[in-house]
Design a protein with these regions (language model features):
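Gly/Ala-rich beta-loop-alpha elbow adjacent to hydrolase catalytic centers
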Residues: 161-165, 169
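Surface cap/lid and interfacial helix-loop subdomains adjacent to catalytic sites
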Residues: 136-153, 174-322, 326-331, 335, ...
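Loop/turn elements at helix/coil->beta-strand transitions in domains of secreted/extracellular proteins
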Residues: 54-56, 104-108, 153-156, 183-187
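Bacterial Sec-dependent N-terminal signal peptides
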Residues: 1-28
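Active-site catalytic motif of lipid deacylating hydrolases and related acyltransferases
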Residues: 63-155, 296-319, 323-341
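A structural signal for short, well-ordered beta-strand segments and their strand-loop junctions
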Residues: 58-60, 108-112, 159, 187-190, ...
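Acidic helix-start/capping segments at beta-turn-to-alpha-helix junctions
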Residues: 114-118, 162, 192-193
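N-terminal low-complexity, Ser/Thr- and acidic-residue-enriched intrinsically disordered segments
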Residues: 25-86
Length: 341
């Protein structure tokens, strides 16, 4: 029964809710309209009521949470309608997990955006995929601009995202960062996507983390059981840090150093927590984490097998290293304040 409950949480976390396939809505939608981030409804309603009371912020970008869907005229659409309550509910499962991780130490802000659908990723990185993703990024850029100008109020901040959200974080660092804003960037956590050498060479704000305390860096990794779990989307990836021991070489991080693997329910409550269960070591050939202590069968999500085959732990990456990541956010925040003042 416990295993069954965890599997349910996994599906909620990644938002692979099969009822989203082909849903129709009761009114006309137009996903071509840019989202309005002056409207509070365009933002996730935080579980934490004391927004802006902490010393640092996190700007979080959700992963892919919806499938292709039809509007009331029968048109098949490939981007989220952020005003659709069922689609918002699908996104919230992933956002609740992220808020639980980042929100204990930071003010938590997460925009709803016209993210692309699961099916759109089968086209990556072709022109049609890019057209759809450009719609998503136009929202993210607008939301980030509004956040910096009207919400941040000069505080240090963290950028974070998983999967599609990680890709969006990477693109924000490429296109929407400047020196003044970068001075306040504690770190970025684009987890669950790839970064190639050309991107690193051509973008000065894409700086891979080397330890647990460096600042203005990107903390990125992808988790698999072995080569069988490698995703085609990880091709040419060059960035990986081990979130258990914060090494970038092949030093093995045994499970005793894992502070806690945590699974969260849709209401933010902890469904299960276990310290010392997951170990990991970087494989330098592919720049991914090889994970020990997790079952490929248990965490397999067949709905995304073409993107992430059995043996990939893409869905569980926040969960597996939850307490280590949570502590690292605090450690880097303290490091930022110690170096600035």
């Amino acid at each position: 029964m416990r295993s069954l409950n965890i599997k349910k949480v996994i599906f909620i976390t990644i938002c692979l809710l099969t009822f989203q396939i082909g849903i129709s809505c009761t009114k006309d939608e137009n996903v071509n309209n840019r989202s309005d981030y002056q409207n509070p409804k365009s933002w996730y309603k935080s579980l934490n009521e004391s927004q802006s009371s902490k010393r640092a912020d996190v700007f979080y970008i959700a992963p892919t949470c919806i499938f292709d869907w039809k509007d009331s005229s029968g048109q098949l659409l490939h981007n989220m309608d952020i005003n659709n309550e069922r689609q918002r509910a699908a996104v919230n499962g992933a956002v609740v997990l992220a808020e639980k991780l980042f929100g204990d130490s930071c003010n938590f802000y997460a925009p709803y955006y016209r993210q692309i659908t699961i099916e759109s990723w089968y086209l990556y990185p072709h022109t049609e995929w890019q057209k759809r993703f450009d719609i998503a990024m136009s929202d993210i850029k607008s939301a980030f601009d509004y956040y910096i100008k009207h919400i941040n109020n000069g505080r240090p901040f963290i950028l974070a995202g998983h999967s599609q959200g990680a890709k969006a974080v990477i693109e924000l660092l490429k296109s929407s960062m400047n020196e003044e804003t970068y001075k306040r960037l504690i770190a970025a956590y684009p987890i669950g996507f790839s970064i190639n050498q050309t991107e690193l060479d051509q973008n000065k704000y894409l700086v891979p983390a080397q330890d647990s305390l460096d600042l203005g860096v990107i903390i990125a990794f992808n988790s698999v059981i072995d080569n069988s779990g490698l995703s085609p989307m990880l091709k040419d990836n060059k960035v990986c840090i081990n979130p258990i021991n914060w090494k970038t070489d092949e030093t093995y991080a045994d499970s005793t150093k894992n502070r806690g693997t945590v699974f969260i329910g849709p209401d933010g409550s902890i469904v299960s927590e276990r310290a010392g269960s997951i170990a990991a070591k970087i494989n330098k050939e592919h720049n991914v984490l090889f994970v020990e202590g997790a079952s490929a069968d248990k965490y397999y999500v067949p709905q995304i097998k073409l993107l992430f085959p059995k043996g990939s732990f893409h869905v569980q990456e926040f969960n597996f290293y939850f307490r280590n990541l949570q502590k690292n956010v605090i450690d880097r925040m303290h490091s930022w304040y110690n170096k600035r003042y």
